[in-house]
């Protein structure tokens, strides 16, 4: 499906806005990498990478984490929930609960 990624990003944006999150995005200075959304939850600035499938490769999110060392990051996809070294993999169907889920670690 040609628009699967765009529709998935739109869904995530709507879920984030329901929670009153202010939404931004990030691009690298060379415009090679981009993170779909950046928001603040409590005292944390949270980069969010959206994947429409189970694909867990998020090179842009890896670049952001390398450059800025955020305590918490989110990748949302069709994969199962997992927390690994400050990286939260949140299934798409749970992204509306992100604000609660990032308090688990």
Regions found by a protein language model. Give the residues of each.
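A cross-kingdom feature that marks ATP-driven nucleic-acid transaction machinery
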Residues: 1-105
């Amino acid at each position: 499906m040609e628009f699967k990624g765009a529709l998935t990003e739109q869904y995530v944006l709507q879920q984030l806005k329901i929670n009153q999150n202010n939404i931004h995005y990030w691009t690298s200075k060379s415009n090679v990498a981009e993170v779909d959304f950046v928001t603040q939850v409590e005292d944390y600035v949270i980069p969010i990478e959206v994947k429409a499938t189970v694909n867990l490769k998020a090179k842009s999110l890896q670049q952001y984490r390398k450059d800025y060392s955020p305590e918490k990051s989110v990748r949302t996809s069709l994969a199962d929930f997992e927390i690994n070294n400050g990286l939260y993999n949140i299934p798409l169907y749970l992204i509306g609960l992100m604000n609660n889920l990032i308090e688990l670690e």
